[in-house]
Amino acid sequence: MEAHQFIKAPGITTAIEQAALAAANSALANAVVVRPFLSHQQVEILINLMQPRQLVFRPEVFWNHPIQRVIHNELEQYCRARSGRCLEIGAHPRSINDNPNVLHRCFLHPVGRDVQRWYTAPTRGPAANCRRSALRGLPPADRTYCFDGFAGCRFAAETGVALYSLHDLQPADVAEAMARHGMTRLYAAFHLPPEVLLPPGTYRTSSYLLIHDGKRAVVTYEGDTSAGYNHDVATLRTWIRTTKVVGEHPLVIERVRGIGCHFVLLITAAPEPSPMPYVPYPRSTEVYVRSIFGPGGSPSLFPTACAVKSTFHAVPTHIWDRLMLFGATLDDQAFCCSRLMTYLRGISYKVTVGALVANEGWNATEDALTAVITAAYLTICHQRYLRTQAISKGMRRLELEHAQKFISRLYSWLFEKSGRDYIPGRQLQFYAQCRRWLSAGFHLDPRTLVFDESVPCSCRTTIRRIAGKFCCFMKWLGQECSCFLQPAEGLAGDQGHDNEAYEGSDVDTAEPATLDITGSYIVDGRSLQTVYQALDLPADLVARAARLSATVTVTETSGRLDCQTMIGNKTFLTTFVDGARLEVNGPEQLNLSFDSQQCSMAAGPFCLTYAAVDGGLEVHFSTAGLESRVVFPPGNAPTAPPSEVTAFCSALYRHNRQSQRQSVIGSLWLHPEGLLGLFPPFSPGHEWRSANPFCGESTLYTRTWSTITDTPLTVGLISGHLDAAPHSGGPPATATGPAVGSSDSPDPDPLPDVTDGSRPSGARPAGPNPNGVPQRRLLHTYPDGAKIYVGSIFESECTWLVNASNAGHRPGGGLCHAFFQRYPDSFDATKFVMRDGLAAYTLTPRPIIHAVAPDYRLEHNPKRLEAAYRETCARRGTAAYPLLGAGIYQVPVSLSFDAWERNHRPFDELYLTELAARWFESNRPGQPTLNITEDTARAANLALELDSGSEVGRACAGCKVEPGVVRYQFTAGVPGSGKSKSVQQADVDVVVVPTRELRNAWRRRGFAAFTPHTAARVTSGRRVVIDEAPSLPPHLLLLHMQRAASVHLLGDPNQIPAIDFEHTGLIPAIRPELVPTSWWHVTHRCPADVCELVRGAYPKIQTTSKVLRSLFWGEPAVGQKLVFTQAAKAAHPGSITVHEAQGATFTTTTIIATADARGLIQSSRAHAIVALTRHTEKCVILDSPGLLREVGISDAIVNNFFLSGGEVGHQRPSVIPRGNPDRNVDVLAAFPPSCQISAFHQLAEELGHRPAPVAAVLPPCPELEQGLLYLPQELASCDSVVTFELTDIVHCRMAAPSQRKAVLSTLVGRYGRRTRLYDAGHTDVRASLARFIPTLGRVTATTCELFELVEAMVEKGQDGSAVLELDLCSRDVSRITFFQKDCNKFTTGETIAHGKVGQGIFRWSKTFCALFGPWFRAIEKAILSLLPQAVFYGDAYDDSVFSAAVAGASHAMVFENDFSEFDSTQNNFSLGLECAIMEECGMPQWLVRLYHAVRSAWILQAPKESLRGFWKKHSGEPGSLLWNTVWNMAIIAHCYEFRDLQVAAFKGDDSVVLCSEYRQSPGAGSLIAGCGLKLKADFRPIGLYAGVVVAPGLGALPDVVRFAGRLSEKNWGPDPERAEQLRLAVQDFLRRLTNVAQICVEVVSRVYGVSPGLVHNLIGMLQTIGDGKAHFTESVKPILDLTHSIMHRSE
């Protein structure tokens, strides 16, 4: 027996599962989104109709007929995607504004239901003109639509779209209409139910109900609440049967898409239509069964009753097929009508077994059941009769054939030959039926219908043929032909079409007369009063505009107008193009419709036309029912005073912001050039030009400015500034600079002093006491300067006072009443200067914020409470708060206090009542508490009971730990930090210590010290200090902490914890989580080398010891011996265990590691830490088993350093001094935080990126060209990636993630490719490199470089345990580890890199890094010391220096070079150049040869794969940045020549050169071809380099777009630490923007070709993220797997 079919194949199963999952992911990514709410039955209908398309249900709207509309939308999307710019027939009014690609729309004058549709049409945009013409009977306003119908219109278009609008036209009529339009293709959607082919009746299917009266067919779908479709039956039948039109206008009709009985017909004009038979309903789910007695007969005296009966009934195909199969296979004796009825009844019930539908069922009427039983019974009877007759006649025929004689057979063999047309069985013709016989059948199966009919064109072909013959006869007689009398249709080109969009013209059309309006015109505000009236502008703004005039310079090009508007000292630029987006102050979007041929433009309710006249430019405005004509004369307007212009711009901005707050949908955002321009109120592409575009004034005219400026005082106080002014005793200084200003405008009044005795009118004395002496009491001060007081809020000297107001901001009770008594004018709503949520800001009579907390008497709303505090932070200066809601609204004090803590700003103040102050005293921040639960107390008491039975623990008898809360102070510190010596005898009564040695040491100092068990008698009610608290048994620790009056813990959490000697399991269960209240990081005991070894456990450790090296290996034992186990203590007399040595200090020690301590040291590194930190001068380590080396305690780093030729000495440090930029300009303060979602969506819109359907792509693995690849047995891979992200739109290249298939593709695709070798000398290249790096002298690696190497390792959390002795026979010494890298390179192109392999990160062994690292650091220092002044290397410079150098090169251009496959193209030549430079520096020859050997042939070790290869460069090797930068400099210096080189910068494969001109060197070709270099040079005014934008004359500016784009790729999870790291990175980036934010807006927008508003928005978004207010989304995306196989070739 073979059993191979039962063997499980995991690989095949996994592959099948992955393929299935990939298919499912692909289906979901391309699914049809169903938005309406549906019933369960409607959902099933849609799923069946839309198969095999995947559906995604997201119900959010109610539709009257959802099934038809979903199908309609799907077919509409198909038609519009393929038709492009087209003519649309019978467009739905609601779709007009959504489809700008339509050239022309043909309508009929509305009647009946169409009138209702036009009334509900949009009243804005292009639909508004169509609606107005349809309802008022007006002629069309332009040529984009007509009401002549498709048959009566002659607008030329090559392609057309008709969505359910041709049901009243025959195919012949459509053919003629298409000919009139010059149309070659027409996409038409039809509803063609098969029931129209049947006789009149009522037909109910699973999807719809169709009533057919012989002339009209009415279709109503399941669940519809409106009237159904009503079509002409004869027309529908023609469309179902017809596949072509013949005659003068031949057509081919093809069904290109179908959903149920909805079809898309592609009607194409073809000269010679060919037969195109088709099956219209191949997926029909119904069979139509004939009812013998139906409306066709006369069954009763009431003919009206017959109209609701059907001659055919729709029966599900599965019901009919199963019924016929059952009846046809029944035994003759069992066949009867009752048995058929019983079976039909059984299969008509729906049966579900779990999730499996065993029987779909059928809900049929009595008439349908009767007809089905009758038809089935008669059909089966007929079939049984045929079966009987066929068998009988067949048997007789067989008898006759077999009875034939030889002569008859010979005759058949000779004369009855079989030809090609012979079909077995055709010789038998026993029975022939007639179509009209009853035996011909009782049912119609639509699945078998085939149609291929043609209809003739309805034009008068006979008359035209006769006329043609007559013309020919007249010509034969020599007369003129009368064909010219035939009217010519309007066609284009050689055919006379009037639409230039028509494609196919071979004759040049006549050029129309062009209207050129280029020139300068004078715009006077007094002439635009009608426009201002239509815009409903306030009177003061109209008055200011009337006093101004502007000069507008227009430049007209093809389809474009460029306007430069000069208003006083300000210049604005606008660009008018069709489809330009207009800036609005709400969620609605407006696009400009601009027709340069018709000289018109429109958007929303605004439209205008213009024309050049003798007097200048005439503009006709039509806005909101008001019309006016204005003629703008040519010339230049007089210059307006700058103060008037500034005042006008400020008033206009205030009007925009007020409209934005008061409008729900928003309106057009008005710019100065929009009101004082040629084409008001339009200002697309608004740009403000100034001599100093970075002063910040341009933000005033855009809607991204977030302040409201009524007075200069408001500007000084209200803004989105996040950093409060420094607070030092008095009130903080408040910025009061002008928001609108120029050199001519006066300075605004300073902020009035609201804290002195002279107050504005309406203000009452602020102090609650007549003497003016503050009665407040300070309770707590936060690190950020915020303070908590108990007392009156009116004693505060803060800039703002916060009132606990109500939602209506009316005077109330409590604190609100006190505010009303002192400041009654502050409740005047007309004087509120700003609202943020429910909070209201006022400056009358002093700055006050009315905040609204939730009413907890009605509903607990923590989110509203948080918002109440958050809404008070949109200010400058400090604020004094009460506890919002804690009074009348009964908000708990704790909740309100926590909300204030989370939402206050630096130097703010909180004022508490006496009752709230008592709560605060008992819950003071910074005092940790230990919560002893009942379970913990129960376990501790059990441990105490066990101890009391022993000799040592007799003192614990009767002691008990109770559940509760214990407060404590915990001083933690590094070993030897002086924790114990800091305790004074006057501060403590009892000291508890874990060991006798420590007890004796404390007693020698005069303290009353006890061991833990003995101390149980004396700690009750005493001041207790517990030394080495983490090592105390936890049940005794809890006992003493609970009994003591006050407890002060000393200890080190990283040292040996309490040990469960009895193995009861209670110690780990009871051990408490103690939080240190203070950390001491300075040790007075440990030497420097010990500090470096233990820095992994103590990152901030520092020492006062002068001893640099104290650890020695292999020397004789000295001083106190320290061992790890009791067995070793017995073997070495005089020694103590490490546990006993905790807290002790010795001058010299000897650590003896024995083999029996292996498990202890490996499981508890704390034992090794304690052993290392006991000495002050010298420690000898005897580690024959190598236990301490396994945990990182080794001298291999030092030994290898001296082995490589290192020397003891000093070098200059490699740290480059850097500083944070001062706030000398602080333009970043003008950028308020903005919405993260809108910023990323705007970035996606500008870059053209969309949400990626997949997280990454696994490309096909290429062929292995060189090397040897080792594969794992299993290629398991994850199918999806979970990310915690800021947005679902990623702007970085997404390559394959870290998994097996991706690792293989990267190994083979990048490092398994054949290397192009180049054998040549390095002299020429080194000579070229000397332009940047002169000849290096002898370099020495000193202990300074060794220290920097160790310091870098410590900063990365490494302890040196991986550094081994230099044994080249050990694989661990030379191993190169490979990791797959998630590619996160920002790109403005395609983000999903299809077909591109990933990138790798390599890690050389720590031994090699420690061996080569000091030398490479020394070489790098030598290079930096010899670099020319204008050359910048890596990141070894301060950013301000590089920026200053770039700013100095104001007349230079930027040369950029982008390397492709930089690492992969490095070969033997680049490696030889590196080795030549090493030899030039004096590195030992054996070290150079070792480096060459490791680099020339290597093995990359992945987690489960490995690759043996040659030559390729690895990005993670020691000196990677050094040698990549040197190779980059060598290529640039050898391949290019630069004129006027002013600045050059190199970092890795990135380079930039500022020069006036460049060219390729003569010898560059050989190097480029020999090494296979791929260089992509660019030469432009502004460039990109290493994350900055290089702008000559301005400096090096932070690349905001790139930084924001890279943030979109980051995974901000899964733990909060990752999010905090990224938030800090954002804050660092914002600090670089402090003084250059406005410059970045202009420069970065130009280099990327995006709008300045985007960069402005991105900066605001970064501030939101930096404040910790970002919103994250968890997404799960699939991985697209394109791998197929891995091909390799043996070397």
Curated annotation (Swiss-Prot):
Region Disordered: start-end pairs: 722-778
Q: Cross-referenced InterPro entries, in alphabetical order? A: (+)RNA_virus_helicase_core_dom, Alphavirus-like_MT_dom, DNA/RNA_pol_sf, Hepatitis-E_Cys-pept, Hepatitis-E_hinge, Hepeviridae_RdRp, Macro_dom, Macro_dom-like
Give the start-end ranges of region NTPase/helicase: 958-1202
| Location in the cell | Host cytoplasm; Host cytoplasm, Host perinuclear region
Q: Where is this region: Zinc-binding?
A: 510-691
Comment field on protein domains? Contains a methyltransferase domain, a Y-domain, a putative protease region, a zinc-binding region with similarity to calycins, a proline-rich disordered hypervariable region (HVR), a macro domain (also called X-domain), a helicase domain and an RNA-dependent RNA polymerase domain. Since the boundaries and the activity of the putative protease are not clearly defined, the zinc-binding region might be part of the putative protease.
- Region annotation (RNA-directed RNA polymerase) maps to 1205-1691
Database matches in Pfam families: DUF3729, Macro, Peptidase_C41, RdRP_2, Viral_helicase1, Vmethyltransf
Q: How is its activity regulated?
A: Putative protease: Inhibited by chymostatin.
One GO term of the cellular component aspect? host cell perinuclear region of cytoplasm
Q: Can you quote the record's cofactor note?
A: For methyltransferase activity.
Q: What is this protein called?
A: Non-structural polyprotein pORF1
Keywords, alphabetical: ATP-binding, Disulfide bond, Helicase, Host cytoplasm, Hydrolase, Magnesium, Metal-binding, Methyltransferase, Nucleotide-binding, Nucleotidyltransferase, Protease, RNA-binding, RNA-directed RNA polymerase, Thiol protease, Transferase, Viral RNA replication, Zinc
Q: Which organism is it from?
A: Hepatitis E virus genotype 2 (isolate Human/Mexico)
Q: How is it modified after translation?
A: ORF1 polyprotein does not seem to be processed into distinct enzymatic domains by a viral protease belonging to ORF1, but could be processed by a host serine protease like thrombin.
As its record notes, the protein acts as a catalyst of: RNA(n) + a ribonucleoside 5'-triphosphate = RNA(n+1) + diphosphate; GTP + S-adenosyl-L-methionine = N(7)-methyl-GTP + S-adenosyl-L-homocysteine
Q: Which residues are noted in the entry as Zn(2+)-binding?
A: H671, E673, H686
